């Protein structure tokens, strides 16, 4: 009889020890816990030191490079009566001839019976960043004896740009980058009467502040004394408040206390009392943009003379991206929701087809 050999006894694999504490699921991003700081489970959570450099902060540089390569669109509309220096101010803001210069009507010419919409686009490059700037002018606004509802063509144009963007969004063969012709900012020029807003001013801002970012400015403010300017600005702010008109930046869209603090200062400054000029003068050994008067040169960028630099810094240097975001996230989304609700939704549009539904806005 053969000898029975007992089966070989193999060592059992080690069973990992059950953790003494199981952390609940968290939506916080994973952060490695530091080594050598104590017992198990310590050093986890937000604010813990990283073991080494990861590189997540390079996302800012990545975004910057993509923006510089692609560029961006910025569309500004100027509205106001003829002769208030709309084109000059826009050209001064962007330091180039970007706006068509309005011409004064001669006796032989007829003033347009309705408001016209004319736009011109330019590509501006600064520091490697390209911006396609489109300036939308509205000749004929407020120039009639009867100006009833003269804001309607402007409102129609703004909504048409929302409609154009919406149709591109629902297109089956949607472009990788949808051309953006939506109006991001409307500069509304108030005549420097020194008295109060006209009914036309109130009606325009009341209707248009619902669909576009309005920034009111007092044109040719050098025609007012400092005292008249201060009183006029206070009166305009009071009238806007009484009429329930909220210009940009609207209080309800302040994201945090820092935003609120910064925007409150801007709201207290509005309307901006501005002067525009494309002419240079020698002042104290320096070349400055300004307007020559009997009392001297009004320097455009001197904050003691006017608020042009405040307007420029606000509109371009601190709030340009926010103007675009409020346009997309608030005004356009409001239009989009109403459009879809009123028409039972939009069906996708093929590259060869057309959506026959028209906007009721």
From Swiss-Prot:
<feature type="domain" description="Septin-type G">
    <location>
        <begin position="70"/>
        <end position="342"/>
    </location>
</feature>
<dbReference type="InterPro" id="IPR016491">
    <property type="entry name" value="Septin"/>
</dbReference>
<feature type="binding site">
    <location>
        <position position="291"/>
    </location>
    <ligand>
        <name>GTP</name>
    </ligand>
</feature>
<feature type="region of interest" description="Disordered">
    <location>
        <begin position="341"/>
        <end position="361"/>
    </location>
</feature>
<dbReference type="Pfam" id="PF00735">
    <property type="entry name" value="Septin"/>
</dbReference>
<feature type="region of interest" description="Disordered">
    <location>
        <begin position="1"/>
        <end position="46"/>
    </location>
</feature>
<feature type="compositionally biased region" description="Low complexity">
    <location>
        <begin position="15"/>
        <end position="34"/>
    </location>
</feature>
<feature type="binding site">
    <location>
        <begin position="220"/>
        <end position="228"/>
    </location>
    <ligand>
        <name>GTP</name>
    </ligand>
</feature>
<dbReference type="InterPro" id="IPR008114">
    <property type="entry name" value="Septin3"/>
</dbReference>
<keyword id="KW-0547">Nucleotide-binding</keyword>
<feature type="binding site">
    <location>
        <position position="114"/>
    </location>
    <ligand>
        <name>GTP</name>
    </ligand>
</feature>
<protein>
    <recommendedName>
        <fullName>Neuronal-specific septin-3</fullName>
    </recommendedName>
</protein>
<dbReference type="InterPro" id="IPR027417">
    <property type="entry name" value="P-loop_NTPase"/>
</dbReference>
<comment type="function">
    <text>May be involved in cytokinesis.</text>
</comment>
<dbReference type="GO" id="GO:0005940">
    <property type="term" value="C:septin ring"/>
</dbReference>
<dbReference type="GO" id="GO:0060090">
    <property type="term" value="F:molecular adaptor activity"/>
</dbReference>
<feature type="binding site">
    <location>
        <position position="276"/>
    </location>
    <ligand>
        <name>GTP</name>
    </ligand>
</feature>
<dbReference type="GO" id="GO:0003924">
    <property type="term" value="F:GTPase activity"/>
</dbReference>
<dbReference type="GO" id="GO:0098793">
    <property type="term" value="C:presynapse"/>
</dbReference>
<feature type="compositionally biased region" description="Gly residues">
    <location>
        <begin position="36"/>
        <end position="46"/>
    </location>
</feature>
<feature type="compositionally biased region" description="Polar residues">
    <location>
        <begin position="349"/>
        <end position="361"/>
    </location>
</feature>
<comment type="similarity">
    <text>Belongs to the TRAFAC class TrmE-Era-EngA-EngB-Septin-like GTPase superfamily. Septin GTPase family.</text>
</comment>
<dbReference type="GO" id="GO:0008104">
    <property type="term" value="P:protein localization"/>
</dbReference>
<feature type="region of interest" description="G4 motif">
    <location>
        <begin position="219"/>
        <end position="222"/>
    </location>
</feature>
<dbReference type="GO" id="GO:0031105">
    <property type="term" value="C:septin complex"/>
</dbReference>
<feature type="region of interest" description="G1 motif">
    <location>
        <begin position="80"/>
        <end position="87"/>
    </location>
</feature>
<dbReference type="GO" id="GO:0032153">
    <property type="term" value="C:cell division site"/>
</dbReference>
<dbReference type="GO" id="GO:0005525">
    <property type="term" value="F:GTP binding"/>
</dbReference>
<feature type="region of interest" description="G3 motif">
    <location>
        <begin position="137"/>
        <end position="140"/>
    </location>
</feature>
<keyword id="KW-0342">GTP-binding</keyword>
<dbReference type="InterPro" id="IPR030379">
    <property type="entry name" value="G_SEPTIN_dom"/>
</dbReference>
<keyword id="KW-0963">Cytoplasm</keyword>
<dbReference type="GO" id="GO:0061640">
    <property type="term" value="P:cytoskeleton-dependent cytokinesis"/>
</dbReference>
<dbReference type="GO" id="GO:0015630">
    <property type="term" value="C:microtubule cytoskeleton"/>
</dbReference>
<feature type="binding site">
    <location>
        <begin position="80"/>
        <end position="87"/>
    </location>
    <ligand>
        <name>GTP</name>
    </ligand>
</feature>
């Amino acid at each position: 009889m053969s000898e029975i050999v007992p089966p070989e006894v193999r060592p059992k694999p080690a069973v990992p020890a059950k953790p003494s504490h199981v952390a609940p699921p968290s939506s916080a991003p994973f952060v490695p816990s530091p080594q050598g700081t104590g017992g198990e489970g310590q050093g986890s959570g937000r604010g813990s030191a990283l073991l080494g450099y990861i590189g997540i902060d390079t996302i800012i540089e990545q975004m910057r490079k993509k923006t510089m390569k692609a560029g961006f669109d910025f569309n500004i509309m100027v509205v106001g009566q003829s002769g208030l220096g709309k084109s000059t101010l826009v050209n001064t803001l962007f330091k180039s001839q970007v706006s068509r210069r309005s011409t004064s009507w001669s006796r032989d010419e007829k003033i347009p019976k309705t408001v016209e919409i004319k736009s011109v686009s330019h590509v501006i490059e600064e520091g490697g960043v390209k911006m396609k700037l489109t300036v939308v002018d509205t000749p004929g606004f407020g120039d009639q004896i009867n100006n009833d509802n003269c804001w309607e063509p402007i409102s129609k144009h703004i909504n048409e740009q929302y409609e154009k963007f919406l149709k591109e969004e629902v297109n089956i063969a949607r472009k990788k980058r949808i051309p953006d012709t939506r109006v991001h900012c409307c500069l509304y020029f108030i005549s420097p009467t020194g008295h109060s807003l006209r009914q036309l001013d109130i009606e325009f801002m009341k209707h248009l502040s619902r669909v576009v970012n309005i920034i009111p400015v007092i044109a040719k403010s050098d025609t007012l004394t400092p005292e008249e300017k201060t009183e006029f600005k206070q009166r305009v702010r009071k009238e806007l408040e009484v009429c329930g008109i909220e210009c940009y930046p609207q209080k309800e869209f302040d994201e945090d206390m820092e935003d609120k603090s910064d925007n409150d200062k801007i709201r207290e400054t509005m309307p901006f009392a501005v002067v525009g000029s494309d002419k240079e003068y020698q002042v104290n050994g320096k070349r400055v943009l300004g307007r020559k008067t009997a009392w001297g040169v009004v320097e455009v960028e001197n904050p003691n003379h006017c608020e042009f630099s405040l307007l420029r810094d606000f509109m371009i240097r601190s709030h340009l991206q926010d103007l675009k975001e409020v346009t997309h996230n608030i005004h356009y989304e409001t239009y989009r929701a109403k459009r879809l609700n009123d028409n039972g939704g939009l069906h996708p549009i093929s590259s060869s087809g057309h959506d026959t539904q028209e906007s009721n806005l």
